[in-house]
């Protein structure tokens, strides 16, 4: 009996272990070859298994990946959810169990429709199905496209392909490489190892090619204020003005910067509650030929709440006035943090489902760029930076920089903020635009148009990051075409993988 149980569980247990190791491919560890080896081993474990067995093996792999990869979510649940330990663990388990569904679905589809481990399955079907299930995870229930394998390649040779097809093209090449390794192992066709070698070599070969051209004559001095405000104290009425004045004092020391950036919701008040302060600092910025960008919470006349970005000082908007149409309003809201699905049912159950500021409304998917001191910035508030298509559609021909404001204080000393920064770097590389990332307690950083970090300040310190950023002219193929050519290839791959074995028969 025990032998039978062990026989049934050894592949799922091995898959869970391999899935758990995948987190090492991402920040802060960045052992990027693991992102290729992990799905390769998964494909080996799936070989010659029934669709039902494959589903559980793939599901176990996903349990391992997300148990380690999104462990940082537990920091927020336990620190701010107001629930007992058992409830925290249950919620975390539910999240991991849900996210693992997609790797289970991949494995089931892979073995149901392509039962033989042929070359077409390894190089065409498996990579295509992986991208489809990744896309589903990034779309269903507003989406959670975190830990896409392509992100792990930001400092690897494959990164050179990001301006061509985005992070999804990198994921495709990771899976093609994994499929080649798995095929080589199963069929002892060691020549197949040349496929990942060729892909890596091609990445090295094109890494020096610039899709965009820097404009050094428009180099801009920026100052990013990292306030390091305690999240537990931030919204207490007694802390409102100490927090606001902390940002104001640090700003006064940096009026020589062209653009000064405060993080997401830096001002712990509704905009309508602090008009005098905003008017005064708007005037001060104009007097110093500078501009200030800040995150702020807004309330419309019909009592809709928005997580917004406001630009003050030297802007095209004139003197400060409360005008909701001149703000950027966050579109992609964080589930449970900024909106609660099925809120009529969930809110009464536990404090976690009734957090402050968890009833926001959405802004439009595409909105005008933020303009400050003549520079145009495509904005993304916190979680939005992980949605590559939204960021892509908000970058225009006039865009100089990508701007992202965040508050990762919810996740403490976990790996979450480091993974978040890794994703933000990919947006800069994909779109050929320098990135400005201002946060409450880190990671506050700026990157060049290739996603390389130019300057950053330490986490968990009050600090000001000073840097000079050079905007770019031109565009990348990814910004022009998006991912539709890639998904055309995905559809073609599935058709070929289905047809080729039958042609031989």
Swiss-Prot record:
Residues at the active site: 264 (proton acceptor), 330, 382 (nucleophile)
GO MF entries: N-acyltransferase activity
Superkingdom of the source species: Bacteria
Record-annotated CN hydrolase domain positions: 225-471
E.C. no: 2.3.1.269
TM annotation in the entry: 26-46, 66-86, 89-109, 129-149, 161-181, 186-206, 481-501
Gene3D superfamilies noted in UniProt: Carbon-nitrogen hydrolase (3.60.110.10)
GO biological process, one term: lipoprotein biosynthetic process
InterPro entries linked: Apolipo_AcylTrfase (IPR004563), C-N_Hydrolase (IPR003010), C-N_Hydrolase_sf (IPR036526), LNT_N (IPR045378)
Cellular location(s): Cell inner membrane
Matches recorded under SUPFAM superfamilies: Carbon-nitrogen hydrolase
UniProt keyword list: Acyltransferase, Cell inner membrane, Cell membrane, Membrane, Transferase, Transmembrane, Transmembrane helix
A GO term from the CC aspect: plasma membrane
Membrane association type: Multi-pass membrane protein
Function according to Swiss-Prot or TrEMBL: Catalyzes the phospholipid dependent N-acylation of the N-terminal cysteine of apolipoprotein, the last step in lipoprotein maturation.
Annotated PANTHER family: APOLIPOPROTEIN N-ACYLTRANSFERASE (PTHR38686:SF1)
Family statement: Belongs to the CN hydrolase family. Apolipoprotein N-acyltransferase subfamily.
Protein name listed in UniProt: Apolipoprotein N-acyltransferase
Top-level taxonomy: Bacteria, Pseudomonadati, Pseudomonadota, Gammaproteobacteria, Vibrionales
The gene coding this protein: lnt
């Amino acid at each position: 009996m025990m032998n039978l149980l062990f026989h049934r569980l050894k592949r799922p247990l091995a898959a869970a272990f391999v899935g758990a190791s995948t987190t090492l491919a991402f920040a802060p560890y960045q052992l990027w070859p693991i992102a290729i080896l992990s799905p390769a081993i998964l494909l080996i474990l799936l070989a010659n298994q029934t669709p039902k067995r494959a589903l559980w093996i793939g599901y176990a792999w996903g349990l391992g990946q997300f148990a380690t990869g999104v462990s940082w979510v537990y920091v927020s649940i336990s620190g701010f959810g107001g629930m007992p330990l058992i409830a925290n663990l249950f919620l975390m388990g539910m999240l991991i169990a849900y996210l693992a569904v997609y790797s289970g679905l991949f494995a089931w589809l892979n073995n149901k429709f392509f039962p033989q481990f042929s070359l077409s399955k390894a190089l065409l079907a498996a990579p295509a199905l992986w991208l489809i299930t990744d896309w589903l995870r990034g779309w269903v229930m507003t989406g959670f496209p975190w830990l896409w394998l392509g992100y792990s390649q930001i400092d690897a040779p494959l990164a050179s392909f990001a301006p061509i097809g985005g992070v999804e093209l990198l994921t495709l090449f990771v899976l093609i490489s994994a499929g080649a390794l798995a095929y080589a192992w199963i069929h002892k066709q060691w020549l197949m190892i040349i496929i990942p070698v060729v892909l890596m070599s091609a990445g090295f070969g094109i890494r020096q090619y610039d899709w965009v051209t820097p404009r050094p004559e428009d180099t801009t001095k920026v100052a990013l204020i990292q306030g390091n405000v305690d999240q537990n104290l931030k919204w207490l009425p007694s802390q409102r003005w100490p927090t606001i004045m902390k940002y104001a004092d640090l700003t006064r020391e940096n009026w020589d910067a062209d653009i000064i950036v405060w993080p997401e919701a830096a001002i712990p008040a509704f905009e309508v509650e602090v008009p005098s302060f905003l008017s005064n600092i708007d005037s001060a910025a104009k007097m110093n030929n500078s501009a200030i960008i800040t995150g702020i919470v807004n309330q419309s006349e019909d009592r809709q709440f928005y997580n917004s970005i406001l630009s003050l000082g030297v802007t095209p908007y004139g003197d400060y006035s409360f005008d909701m149409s001149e703000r950027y309003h966050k579109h992609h809201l964080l589930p449970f943090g900024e909106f609660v699905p099925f809120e009529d049912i969930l809110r009464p159950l536990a404090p976690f489902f009734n957090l402050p500021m968890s009833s926001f409304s959405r802004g439009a998917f595409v909105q005008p760029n933020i303009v400050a001191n003549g520079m145009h910035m495509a904005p993304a508030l916190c979680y939005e930076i992980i949605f590559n298509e939204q960021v892509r559609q908000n970058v225009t021909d006039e865009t100089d920089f990508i701007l992202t404001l965040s508050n990762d204080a919810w996740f403490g000393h976990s790996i979450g903020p480091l993974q978040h920064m890794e994703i933000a770097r990919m947006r800069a590389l994909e779109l050929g635009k320098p990135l400005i990332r201002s946060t409450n307690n880190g990671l506050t950083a700026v990157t060049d148009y290739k996603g390389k970090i130019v300057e950053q300040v330490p986490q968990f310190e009050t600090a000001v990051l000073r840097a000079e950023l050079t905007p770019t002219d031109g565009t990348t193929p990814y910004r022009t075409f998006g991912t539709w050519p890639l998904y055309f290839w995905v559809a073609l791959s599935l058709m070929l993988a289905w047809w080729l074995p039958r042609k031989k028969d």
